Amino acid sequence: MALSINHFYFTIFMEIIIYRRRFTRWGVDGTLVIKGTKVCNTIEHPERFLPAGDYEIAFVSIANKSRKMPVILRKGQAVWEVGINTPCLKPGNGPMTLENGCIILGKAAATGLVIHSQEYFDRLCERLRKASKKKECIKLRIIDWGSDEISIAF
């Protein structure tokens, strides 16, 4: 029996990994990596962060935002189930106002603080939009690592 290429379906995906390095009362500091290369740092609320694990990212219009945002979909969550309380990747400076497991992107300045957030957010969004236009599935993996366990390159 001969099989044609039509019998196989390949899913192309982009995998984003966030290595959480430091858990303090000022926030959860992490490093965002794509294809083995550090893209930026992350910061999350010290208590209201997502559990480590696998998620998907989709661009969705959120009612209280002026543009489509990269939202973080929990396992089995459909895009049409997204609401204003859905966690997302976003620009910002510090984590204390974050709710719902949102993640701020930027350059680490101190524990619990990132700078140049809008610049890093825009760069990552452009990269995610390109992947989305190519119909790539965007996966997010969050791993809890201590600073001693993560490669010095990150």
Please identify what each model-predicted range represents.
Residues F8-K139, I143-I150, F154:
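Cell wall/extracellular polymer interaction/catalysis modules
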